[in-house]
């Protein structure tokens, strides 16, 4: 059994080195090209999908669409879920990473970005960019919508969807594509690879590159590689 992850192509805020999180930004020109190249590469290598899962953020949805279109599979059903959203960076969202490091220190920013269980400063629910004001999340209980997350909380958000939707799809024989975000994919990788809390800090997932997992019947990883 195989599973393919792809982190969205470079976004406009990736290009500007800004914290993005749940803020909804578009792909950059480079990001559009990365997604198209990924789709072509998947086609060249014979990858076909029966179902695709993505987030409710534009950059991941657009990447998913382009990948499927470029691999002649735009007909493949897509399921969009907030549970695959990027980690919510709280008050850091929209801030320049370099300027934030100059203000708080490199080590503090590194901990905010990479630590497994350290929360960023939380965003006020009344903030104009709060997810509580976004109709994408209007169906969710207020106490479920985050104001800031660490990777631990992100994993707790993503895992129920893995167990309820993604894993059963794989086990039923479906060929699965997950088009999501750096930290939601890191959270899934931590779970399926059994990565420790310490080692997950060093895991980077590049934009727009298909990551293939070969899995056994218990969804244990046999092999992992980038196309």
From Swiss-Prot:
Substrate binds at residues 7-14, 20-21, 59, 86-89, 97, 113-114, 182-183. One of its GO terms (molecular function) is phosphoglycerate mutase activity. InterPro entries: His_Pase_superF_clade-1, His_PPase_superfam, Phosphogly_mut1. The record marks 181 as: Transition state stabilizer. GO terms for biological process: gluconeogenesis; glycolytic process. Pathway: Carbohydrate degradation; glycolysis; pyruvate from D-glyceraldehyde 3-phosphate: step 3/5. The active site is at residues 8, 86. It catalyses: (2R)-2-phosphoglycerate = (2R)-3-phosphoglycerate. Homodimer. Belongs to the phosphoglycerate mutase family. BPG-dependent PGAM subfamily. This is 2,3-bisphosphoglycerate-dependent phosphoglycerate mutase.
